[in-house]
């Protein structure tokens, strides 16, 4: 069929045919995950009693926004959380993570990055090196930072985590590979990191950066030892439809604590209008399991094709996928931090 629209060489068409054949079993597995998550989503919408009126937002202060509260109820049910903040005011994953960290930590507390250095946009938030200097980083507010590097094989150093967790207040786990060529951590690994830290320090809060990982499996990190998770609706849970926003979900007391940093101390979750965003947010979230499945199938196809032409992607197409990211070495020596400098993103 594709040759009716594009002038492709026979060798390319044969490569496409072979790639699709090799990916068949993996596609079927991803579709099983999709179907499970879609049924979970449908049950959440049904049990929470979502009605057409809940697609209408609010203006002004947004006090007593029943539709916003209904969205957070559905999200909590679907993700296995006691409570959640799902708001269009979150501008990116980094912004959402920042609100969560500033909400959980106080002066004198320690943030432990248990899975190595977080991706570079968080360096400015934490205050690593010169990043964010003078802008109100965690360290400038008296919060200590500790880090356990990954082992050479990109697996967590559990012995070091157990030692460093003794003095930690919050343990940070980054599920996705971010901008490194490691595999995303599966839920068993997240559970083991959480158990290791909690055994050393029962009072520690396990915080998982869930960006790029939602709906890639039938469970979420809250069922694997996490106390709080956070992510962006610009990515997986927005289904490519939700125009903006993010979420923080988990234990009710911790979400409540964070909500007072999201708005203002003493106000918490009660404030925040939704304007015209709710219909697209409900819609995007509902379709997210299917959209994530298609993103993963595209990734698997690309990974398989790259392997057939001699390039080694991370992960391999046969691997268990725990985020939607694919890495491969293009042979270029150019290296940009995120976000890419503006002069490098303009079309020429």
Stretch-by-stretch model annotation:
Residues 1-3:
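Basic/polar N-terminal segments that are highly enriched at the extreme N-terminus
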Residues 5-9, 15-17, 23-24, 31, ...:
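Conserved PLP-enzyme active-site core in the AAT-like
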Residues 72:
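Generic structural marker for isolated residues within well-ordered, non-membrane alpha-helices
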Residues 318-326:
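Conserved glycine-rich beta-strand-loop-beta hairpin in the small C-terminal domain of fold type I
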Residues 326-335:
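Short glycine/threonine-rich loop-to-helix capping motif typified by GTGT followed
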Residues 336-345:
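Conserved small/polar residues in nucleotide/adenosyl-binding loops
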């Amino acid at each position: 069929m594709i040759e009716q629209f594009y002038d492709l060489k026979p060798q390319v068409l044969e490569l496409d045919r072979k790639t699709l054949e090799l990916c068949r079993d993996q596609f079927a597995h991803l579709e099983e995950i999709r179907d499970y998550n879609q049924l979970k989503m449908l049950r959440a919408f049904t049990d929470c009693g979502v009605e057409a009126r809940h697609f209408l937002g609010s203006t002004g202060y947004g006090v007593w926004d029943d539709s916003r509260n209904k969205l957070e109820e559905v999200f909590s049910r679907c993700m296995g959380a006691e409570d959640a903040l799902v708001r269009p005011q979150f501008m990116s994953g980094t912004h959402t993570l920042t609100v969560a960290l500033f909400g959980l930590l106080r002066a004198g507390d320690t943030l432990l990055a248990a899975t190595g250095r977080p991706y570079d946009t968080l360096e400015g938030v934490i205050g690593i090196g010169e990043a964010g200097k003078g802008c109100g980083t965690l360290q400038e507010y008296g919060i200590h930072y500790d880090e356990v590097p990954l082992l050479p094989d990109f697996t967590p150093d559990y012995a070091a985590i157990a030692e460093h967790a003794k003095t930690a207040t919050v343990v940070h786990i980054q599920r996705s590979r971010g901008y490194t060529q490691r595999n995303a951590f599966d839920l068993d690994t997240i559970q083991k990191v959480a158990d290791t830290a909690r055994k050393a320090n029962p009072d520690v809060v396990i915080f998982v950066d869930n960006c790029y990982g939602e709906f890639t499996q039938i469970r979420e990190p809250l069922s694997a030892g996490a106390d709080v998770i956070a992510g962006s609706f610009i990515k997986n849970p927005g289904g490519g439809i939700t125009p903006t926003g993010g979420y923080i979900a988990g234990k009710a007391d911790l979400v409540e604590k964070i909500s007072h940093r999201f708005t203002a101390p003493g106000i918490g979750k009660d404030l925040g209008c939704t304007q015209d965003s709710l219909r697209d947010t409900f819609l995007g979230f509902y379709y997210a399991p299917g959209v994530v499945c298609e993103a993963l199938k595209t990734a698997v196809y690309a990974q398989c094709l790259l392997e057939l032409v001699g390039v080694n992607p991370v992960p391999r197409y046969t691997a268990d996928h725990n985020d939607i990211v694919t890495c491969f070495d293009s042979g270029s020596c150019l290296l940009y931090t995120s976000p890419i400098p503006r002069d490098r993103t303009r079309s020429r």
